[in-house]
UniProtKB/Swiss-Prot annotation:
Belongs to the MzrA family. Residues 1-11 are cytoplasmic. GO terms for molecular function: protein kinase binding. It holds the Pfam family SecD-TM1. Keywords: Cell inner membrane, Cell membrane, Membrane, Transmembrane, Transmembrane helix. It comes from Dickeya dadantii (strain 3937) (Erwinia chrysanthemi (strain 3937)). It is found in: Cell inner membrane. Interacts with EnvZ. One of its GO terms (cellular component) is plasma membrane. This is Modulator protein MzrA. The lineage of its organism: Bacteria, Pseudomonadati, Pseudomonadota, Gammaproteobacteria, Enterobacterales. Disulfide bonds: none annotated.
Length: 117
């Protein structure tokens, strides 16, 4: 009887080890992060000043646009939105509030621009 148990345990472990990568692969492929949209704001003319993040926050917040973060980056400002559906409205608001800036909406995975103004 001891011999039977010894043979069953390794086969159960082998089966578990064979199925584990498949389970991990399936769980990773089924998880998909929602698309994140960010607005990339750059000055219309090189060297022109951009407003600070608080000004941008005020303009978007007063219109009900939810913001994840506002980050300065290489003479530009990156605004990450909480809701991708609000990107069009946010782009329009910022294009009006910042007439001397270019506002580009991009997906976070680095694909081509969604809209530009």
């Amino acid at each position: 009887m001891m011999t039977n148990r010894r043979f069953r345990k390794p086969s159960a472990w082998r089966l578990l080890l064979l199925l584990l990568p498949l389970v991990v692969l399936l769980s990773m492929s089924s998880r998909r992060l929602p698309d994140e949209v960010m607005l990339h704001i750059t000055p219309l003319h090189q060297g022109a000043p951009l407003p600070d993040g608080f000004y941008i926050y005020q303009r978007l917040n007063e219109r009900g646009i939810a913001i994840k973060s506002i980050t300065p980056e290489n003479d530009s400002i990156i605004v990450r939105l909480s809701s991708p559906e609000q990107s069009g409205a946010a782009r329009e608001i910022l294009s009006t509030a910042l007439p001397y800036a270019i506002v580009i909406a991009q997906r976070s995975n680095g694909t081509s621009p969604v809209t530009r103004s």
